[in-house]
Amino acid sequence: MSGERAKRFPLALEDLKREPRKPEGRVAERQAAGDAARQRLTAAAAVPAAASPIVPERRAPHGGVFAANPARAKQHAPAAPGAAKRAPQGGAKQGDRSAAPNVALSGALALTSERVRERMVERLRANGVADPRVLAAMSAVPRHMFVDPGLAAQAYEDAALPIGHQQTISKPSVVARMIELAAAGRALERVLEIGTGCGYQAAVLSRVARDVYSIERVKPLYERAKLNLRPLRVPNIRLHYGDGRVGLPAAAPFDAIVIAAAGLDVPRALLEQLAIGGRLVAPVGEQAGEQVLTLVERVAPAQWRESRLDRVFFVPLKSGVI
Protein backbone atom coordinates (compact mmCIF):
# COMPACT_ATOMS: atom_id res chain seq x y z
CA MET A 1 0.00 0.00 0.00
CA SER A 2 1.30 3.42 -0.89
CA GLY A 3 2.14 5.88 1.78
CA GLU A 4 -0.65 8.16 0.69
CA ARG A 5 -3.23 5.39 1.00
CA ALA A 6 -1.83 4.37 4.38
CA LYS A 7 -2.34 7.84 5.60
CA ARG A 8 -5.96 7.86 4.42
CA PHE A 9 -6.73 4.40 5.96
CA PRO A 10 -4.61 4.10 9.12
CA LEU A 11 -6.12 0.66 10.15
CA ALA A 12 -5.18 -2.64 8.57
CA LEU A 13 -7.73 -5.38 7.63
CA GLU A 14 -7.08 -7.49 10.73
CA ASP A 15 -7.74 -4.41 12.79
CA LEU A 16 -11.30 -4.42 11.47
CA LYS A 17 -12.17 -7.85 13.12
CA ARG A 18 -14.70 -7.15 15.83
CA GLU A 19 -14.84 -8.92 19.20
CA PRO A 20 -18.12 -10.73 19.71
CA ARG A 21 -20.56 -8.76 21.79
CA LYS A 22 -21.45 -10.14 25.21
CA PRO A 23 -25.10 -11.01 25.59
CA GLU A 24 -27.05 -8.54 27.57
CA GLY A 25 -30.17 -8.68 29.71
CA ARG A 26 -32.35 -11.81 30.16
CA VAL A 27 -31.03 -13.37 26.97
CA ALA A 28 -27.59 -13.29 28.52
CA GLU A 29 -28.84 -14.92 31.71
CA ARG A 30 -30.53 -17.76 29.82
CA GLN A 31 -27.45 -18.38 27.74
CA ALA A 32 -25.22 -18.44 30.82
CA ALA A 33 -27.55 -20.89 32.55
CA GLY A 34 -27.54 -23.15 29.48
CA ASP A 35 -23.75 -23.13 29.39
CA ALA A 36 -23.57 -24.08 33.07
CA ALA A 37 -26.05 -26.93 32.58
CA ARG A 38 -24.06 -28.29 29.62
CA GLN A 39 -20.90 -28.20 31.71
CA ARG A 40 -22.58 -30.20 34.52
CA LEU A 41 -23.89 -32.81 32.10
CA THR A 42 -20.48 -33.16 30.53
CA ALA A 43 -18.86 -33.63 33.94
CA ALA A 44 -21.45 -36.22 35.00
CA ALA A 45 -20.96 -38.22 31.83
CA ALA A 46 -17.22 -38.26 32.41
CA VAL A 47 -17.63 -40.00 35.84
CA PRO A 48 -18.34 -43.78 35.48
CA ALA A 49 -21.39 -45.08 37.42
CA ALA A 50 -20.75 -47.51 40.29
CA ALA A 51 -21.76 -50.91 39.02
CA SER A 52 -23.28 -53.46 41.39
CA PRO A 53 -21.54 -56.83 41.39
CA ILE A 54 -23.20 -59.40 39.22
CA VAL A 55 -23.64 -62.76 40.83
CA PRO A 56 -24.20 -65.68 38.51
CA GLU A 57 -27.52 -67.43 39.07
CA ARG A 58 -27.83 -71.17 39.60
CA ARG A 59 -30.77 -73.09 38.26
CA ALA A 60 -32.91 -74.90 40.80
CA PRO A 61 -33.57 -78.60 40.23
CA HIS A 62 -37.23 -77.98 39.40
CA GLY A 63 -36.95 -74.90 37.26
CA GLY A 64 -36.69 -72.28 39.99
CA VAL A 65 -33.74 -69.96 40.49
CA PHE A 66 -31.22 -70.07 43.31
CA ALA A 67 -29.79 -66.56 43.79
CA ALA A 68 -27.01 -65.75 46.18
CA ASN A 69 -28.09 -62.12 46.15
CA PRO A 70 -31.15 -61.86 48.47
CA ALA A 71 -32.39 -58.75 46.73
CA ARG A 72 -32.29 -60.47 43.36
CA ALA A 73 -33.90 -63.57 44.81
CA LYS A 74 -36.79 -61.51 46.11
CA GLN A 75 -37.05 -59.70 42.80
CA HIS A 76 -37.06 -62.82 40.62
CA ALA A 77 -38.97 -65.21 42.88
CA PRO A 78 -42.05 -66.46 41.00
CA ALA A 79 -45.36 -65.55 42.61
CA ALA A 80 -47.57 -68.40 43.78
CA PRO A 81 -50.77 -68.82 41.76
CA GLY A 82 -53.52 -66.66 43.21
CA ALA A 83 -51.15 -65.07 45.71
CA ALA A 84 -52.30 -61.60 44.79
CA LYS A 85 -55.91 -62.51 45.55
CA ARG A 86 -55.36 -64.28 48.84
CA ALA A 87 -55.47 -62.23 52.03
CA PRO A 88 -53.92 -63.27 55.36
CA GLN A 89 -56.36 -65.23 57.51
CA GLY A 90 -57.20 -64.54 61.14
CA GLY A 91 -56.69 -60.80 61.15
CA ALA A 92 -52.90 -60.92 61.72
CA LYS A 93 -50.41 -59.74 59.11
CA GLN A 94 -48.29 -62.37 57.43
CA GLY A 95 -44.83 -62.62 58.91
CA ASP A 96 -45.84 -60.81 62.10
CA ARG A 97 -44.37 -63.14 64.69
CA SER A 98 -45.20 -60.77 67.51
CA ALA A 99 -48.96 -61.14 66.97
CA ALA A 100 -50.84 -61.63 70.23
CA PRO A 101 -51.94 -65.23 70.97
CA ASN A 102 -55.58 -66.21 71.01
CA VAL A 103 -56.52 -64.99 74.50
CA ALA A 104 -59.92 -66.69 74.50
CA LEU A 105 -58.35 -70.05 73.61
CA SER A 106 -55.64 -69.62 76.25
CA GLY A 107 -58.29 -68.77 78.82
CA ALA A 108 -60.36 -71.81 77.90
CA LEU A 109 -57.35 -74.09 78.20
CA ALA A 110 -56.54 -72.63 81.60
CA LEU A 111 -60.10 -73.20 82.78
CA THR A 112 -59.98 -76.88 81.89
CA SER A 113 -56.84 -77.50 83.90
CA GLU A 114 -57.07 -79.58 87.02
CA ARG A 115 -55.24 -76.91 88.99
CA VAL A 116 -58.08 -74.41 88.53
CA ARG A 117 -60.63 -76.92 89.78
CA GLU A 118 -58.36 -77.87 92.65
CA ARG A 119 -58.31 -74.26 93.80
CA MET A 120 -62.11 -74.32 93.81
CA VAL A 121 -62.03 -77.53 95.86
CA GLU A 122 -59.60 -75.97 98.33
CA ARG A 123 -62.06 -73.13 98.86
CA LEU A 124 -64.85 -75.65 99.44
CA ARG A 125 -62.72 -77.49 101.98
CA ALA A 126 -61.89 -74.22 103.73
CA ASN A 127 -65.64 -73.44 103.90
CA GLY A 128 -66.38 -76.69 105.71
CA VAL A 129 -67.04 -79.34 103.04
CA ALA A 130 -65.30 -82.43 104.41
CA ASP A 131 -66.67 -85.50 102.59
CA PRO A 132 -63.78 -86.73 100.39
CA ARG A 133 -66.21 -88.24 97.87
CA VAL A 134 -67.92 -84.88 97.37
CA LEU A 135 -64.63 -83.03 97.06
CA ALA A 136 -63.34 -85.58 94.55
CA ALA A 137 -66.54 -85.30 92.51
CA MET A 138 -66.37 -81.50 92.46
CA SER A 139 -62.77 -81.75 91.30
CA ALA A 140 -63.57 -84.23 88.54
CA VAL A 141 -66.59 -82.60 86.89
CA PRO A 142 -65.69 -79.73 84.47
CA ARG A 143 -68.19 -77.02 85.41
CA HIS A 144 -67.22 -74.81 82.47
CA MET A 145 -68.75 -77.39 80.11
CA PHE A 146 -72.20 -76.69 81.60
CA VAL A 147 -72.29 -72.89 81.22
CA ASP A 148 -72.45 -70.61 78.20
CA PRO A 149 -69.04 -69.95 76.56
CA GLY A 150 -69.32 -66.28 77.44
CA LEU A 151 -69.48 -67.21 81.14
CA ALA A 152 -66.69 -69.81 81.05
CA ALA A 153 -64.27 -67.42 82.76
CA GLN A 154 -66.57 -67.41 85.81
CA ALA A 155 -67.23 -71.16 85.86
CA TYR A 156 -65.05 -71.88 88.90
CA GLU A 157 -66.01 -68.84 90.91
CA ASP A 158 -68.43 -69.42 93.77
CA ALA A 159 -71.33 -67.83 91.93
CA ALA A 160 -74.69 -68.86 90.50
CA LEU A 161 -74.78 -68.31 86.74
CA PRO A 162 -77.74 -67.97 84.35
CA ILE A 163 -78.46 -70.89 82.02
CA GLY A 164 -81.50 -69.44 80.28
CA HIS A 165 -85.26 -69.75 80.76
CA GLN A 166 -84.97 -67.80 84.04
CA GLN A 167 -82.97 -70.63 85.61
CA THR A 168 -79.48 -70.75 87.09
CA ILE A 169 -76.68 -73.18 87.83
CA SER A 170 -76.17 -73.20 91.61
CA LYS A 171 -73.00 -71.99 93.29
CA PRO A 172 -70.35 -74.72 93.72
CA SER A 173 -70.46 -74.24 97.48
CA VAL A 174 -74.23 -74.83 97.54
CA VAL A 175 -73.98 -77.90 95.28
CA ALA A 176 -71.29 -79.43 97.49
CA ARG A 177 -73.15 -78.56 100.69
CA MET A 178 -76.44 -80.11 99.52
CA ILE A 179 -74.81 -83.31 98.28
CA GLU A 180 -72.81 -83.69 101.47
CA LEU A 181 -75.97 -83.27 103.57
CA ALA A 182 -77.81 -85.80 101.42
CA ALA A 183 -75.03 -88.37 101.65
CA ALA A 184 -74.12 -87.93 105.32
CA GLY A 185 -71.23 -90.35 104.95
CA ARG A 186 -73.46 -93.15 103.64
CA ALA A 187 -73.11 -95.21 100.49
CA LEU A 188 -75.87 -93.91 98.25
CA GLU A 189 -77.68 -96.34 95.98
CA ARG A 190 -80.47 -94.26 94.41
CA VAL A 191 -80.69 -90.50 94.32
CA LEU A 192 -83.47 -88.33 92.88
CA GLU A 193 -82.72 -84.79 91.71
CA ILE A 194 -85.55 -82.31 91.12
CA GLY A 195 -84.50 -79.64 88.62
CA THR A 196 -81.86 -80.95 86.23
CA GLY A 197 -81.11 -77.53 84.79
CA CYS A 198 -77.94 -77.76 82.72
CA GLY A 199 -76.98 -81.14 84.22
CA TYR A 200 -74.02 -80.09 86.38
CA GLN A 201 -75.34 -81.20 89.76
CA ALA A 202 -76.47 -84.51 88.27
CA ALA A 203 -72.93 -85.07 86.99
CA VAL A 204 -71.51 -84.45 90.46
CA LEU A 205 -74.11 -86.73 92.05
CA SER A 206 -73.21 -89.49 89.58
CA ARG A 207 -69.78 -89.75 91.21
CA VAL A 208 -71.24 -90.11 94.69
CA ALA A 209 -74.26 -92.38 94.07
CA ARG A 210 -74.72 -95.61 92.15
CA ASP A 211 -77.79 -94.41 90.21
CA VAL A 212 -79.04 -90.87 89.66
CA TYR A 213 -82.54 -89.97 88.45
CA SER A 214 -83.10 -86.36 87.47
CA ILE A 215 -86.31 -84.54 86.42
CA GLU A 216 -86.54 -81.29 84.44
CA ARG A 217 -89.82 -79.52 83.60
CA VAL A 218 -88.39 -77.10 80.99
CA LYS A 219 -87.96 -79.00 77.71
CA PRO A 220 -85.09 -76.90 76.27
CA LEU A 221 -83.11 -77.33 79.49
CA TYR A 222 -83.82 -81.05 79.47
CA GLU A 223 -82.39 -81.24 75.94
CA ARG A 224 -79.44 -79.07 76.89
CA ALA A 225 -78.59 -81.28 79.87
CA LYS A 226 -78.51 -84.31 77.59
CA LEU A 227 -76.09 -82.55 75.25
CA ASN A 228 -73.89 -81.38 78.12
CA LEU A 229 -73.67 -84.83 79.68
CA ARG A 230 -73.09 -86.74 76.44
CA PRO A 231 -69.33 -85.94 76.10
CA LEU A 232 -68.74 -87.11 79.68
CA ARG A 233 -70.23 -90.55 78.92
CA VAL A 234 -71.90 -90.82 82.31
CA PRO A 235 -73.63 -94.24 82.40
CA ASN A 236 -75.54 -93.95 85.68
CA ILE A 237 -77.72 -90.85 85.06
CA ARG A 238 -81.32 -91.19 83.89
CA LEU A 239 -82.87 -87.93 82.75
CA HIS A 240 -86.65 -87.45 82.73
CA TYR A 241 -88.79 -84.66 81.29
CA GLY A 242 -91.69 -84.06 83.64
CA ASP A 243 -93.15 -82.37 86.71
CA GLY A 244 -90.61 -82.48 89.53
CA ARG A 245 -93.21 -82.01 92.25
CA VAL A 246 -94.65 -85.40 91.34
CA GLY A 247 -91.32 -87.19 91.52
CA LEU A 248 -90.73 -90.68 90.09
CA PRO A 249 -92.88 -93.15 92.02
CA ALA A 250 -91.89 -96.01 89.70
CA ALA A 251 -88.22 -95.68 90.69
CA ALA A 252 -88.79 -95.07 94.42
CA PRO A 253 -87.72 -95.40 97.16
CA PHE A 254 -84.68 -93.14 97.08
CA ASP A 255 -81.82 -92.96 99.57
CA ALA A 256 -81.60 -89.23 98.96
CA ILE A 257 -83.60 -86.52 97.21
CA VAL A 258 -82.05 -83.18 96.25
CA ILE A 259 -84.41 -80.37 95.20
CA ALA A 260 -82.80 -77.50 93.29
CA ALA A 261 -85.74 -75.08 93.53
CA ALA A 262 -87.53 -73.41 96.43
CA GLY A 263 -91.14 -74.05 97.37
CA LEU A 264 -93.25 -72.92 100.30
CA ASP A 265 -93.05 -76.49 101.56
CA VAL A 266 -91.72 -79.89 100.51
CA PRO A 267 -94.23 -81.71 98.27
CA ARG A 268 -95.85 -84.64 100.04
CA ALA A 269 -95.27 -86.91 97.04
CA LEU A 270 -91.52 -86.49 97.42
CA LEU A 271 -91.60 -87.20 101.16
CA GLU A 272 -93.40 -90.46 100.41
CA GLN A 273 -90.74 -91.50 97.90
CA LEU A 274 -87.94 -91.16 100.46
CA ALA A 275 -86.64 -94.46 101.84
CA ILE A 276 -86.64 -95.12 105.58
CA GLY A 277 -83.43 -93.55 106.80
CA GLY A 278 -83.29 -91.45 103.64
CA ARG A 279 -82.51 -87.73 103.57
CA LEU A 280 -84.10 -84.95 101.53
CA VAL A 281 -82.38 -81.59 101.06
CA ALA A 282 -84.36 -78.62 99.73
CA PRO A 283 -84.60 -74.83 99.96
CA VAL A 284 -87.89 -73.80 101.56
CA GLY A 285 -89.38 -70.32 101.57
CA GLU A 286 -90.97 -67.59 99.50
CA GLN A 287 -89.35 -66.34 96.34
CA ALA A 288 -89.31 -62.74 97.55
CA GLY A 289 -88.67 -63.59 101.18
CA GLU A 290 -86.26 -65.66 103.23
CA GLN A 291 -85.34 -69.11 102.00
CA VAL A 292 -83.72 -71.70 104.25
CA LEU A 293 -81.86 -74.83 103.24
CA THR A 294 -83.83 -77.59 104.95
CA LEU A 295 -82.89 -81.19 105.75
CA VAL A 296 -85.72 -83.74 106.10
CA GLU A 297 -84.96 -87.26 107.39
CA ARG A 298 -87.46 -90.11 107.22
CA VAL A 299 -87.12 -91.91 110.54
CA ALA A 300 -90.24 -94.13 110.24
CA PRO A 301 -92.93 -94.97 107.65
CA ALA A 302 -95.04 -92.03 108.81
CA GLN A 303 -92.45 -89.88 110.59
CA TRP A 304 -90.05 -87.26 109.26
CA ARG A 305 -87.62 -85.03 111.10
CA GLU A 306 -86.86 -81.55 109.81
CA SER A 307 -83.77 -79.37 110.38
CA ARG A 308 -83.42 -75.79 109.15
CA LEU A 309 -79.84 -74.93 108.26
CA ASP A 310 -78.52 -72.19 105.95
CA ARG A 311 -80.04 -69.13 104.32
CA VAL A 312 -80.08 -69.56 100.55
CA PHE A 313 -81.73 -68.20 97.42
CA PHE A 314 -83.14 -70.44 94.66
CA VAL A 315 -85.47 -70.14 91.70
CA PRO A 316 -89.09 -71.14 92.51
CA LEU A 317 -90.31 -74.74 92.46
CA LYS A 318 -93.19 -74.88 89.96
CA SER A 319 -95.72 -77.46 88.81
CA GLY A 320 -96.31 -78.70 85.29
CA VAL A 321 -94.05 -78.74 82.26
CA ILE A 322 -93.17 -76.20 79.57
Curated annotation (Swiss-Prot):
GO terms for molecular function: protein-L-isoaspartate (D-aspartate) O-methyltransferase activity. GO terms for biological process: methylation; protein modification process; protein repair. Residues 33-51, 67-91 have a biased composition (Low complexity). It is found in: Cytoplasm. The active site is at S170. Its EC number is 2.1.1.77. HAMAP family: PIMT. Belongs to the methyltransferase superfamily. L-isoaspartyl/D-aspartyl protein methyltransferase family. Catalyzes the methyl esterification of L-isoaspartyl residues in peptides and proteins that result from spontaneous decomposition of normal L-aspartyl and L-asparaginyl residues. It plays a role in the repair and/or degradation of damaged proteins. This is Protein-L-isoaspartate O-methyltransferase. It comes from Burkholderia pseudomallei (strain 668).
